[in-house]
């Protein structure tokens, strides 16, 4: 696992394992003021985890032109300890993201204003993994670039991407392919990735 508790600046520039370059399209690199307002409003109006994920998909599609359908989200108490805890992980070659319910609950109870930005960042990070970005540094860098581009540098989403330890000091990013040592019980989130479901039906 990669402990980010000492990180004090935006992730250093990293390369995608697929192309050797950032996955952000060159034509989207300039700050988009209208985009800031659009996606900020969408995130603000999101009512649940599924809504937040739909914003994640739109943001990634606008920034990279890439998307993936048919994903599921499972919630599980993955625990935590003195060394820290994992926010979420993506089991390799699956269609599910597993999110740790423990920090979700704590953030909702202690600082609910940060709940949506936290969820967005965690889902964005794992969604980028599902798109084939395996390297952790590359994933973090792409998440930061996308966040700044479409939310602005000062937005909580971008602040999470720049230095998550400011808000959740003991949260760690697991290495790609990480699995918890012990078994866990999954609670699947209903209606997740609803836009891809709708496209299959229509």
Where do the language-model regions lie?
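An acidic, glycine-rich, mixed-charge low-complexity segment common to nucleic-acid enzymes
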Residues: 1-9, 14
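Metalloprotease/metallohydrolase-associated module, dominated by Zn2+-dependent proteases
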Residues: 9-12, 30-108, 134-202
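Short acidic, glycine/tyrosine-flanked loop/strand segments centered on an H-E-D-like triad
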Residues: 98-124
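Long, positively charged low-complexity segments
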Residues: 11-29
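Compositionally biased amphipathic helical and low-complexity segments enriched in hydrophobic
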Residues: 3, 16-19, 187
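Active-site recognition of the HExxH zinc-binding catalytic motif
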Residues: 117-136, 140-144
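Intrinsic structural disorder
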Residues: 1-3, 121, 172-176
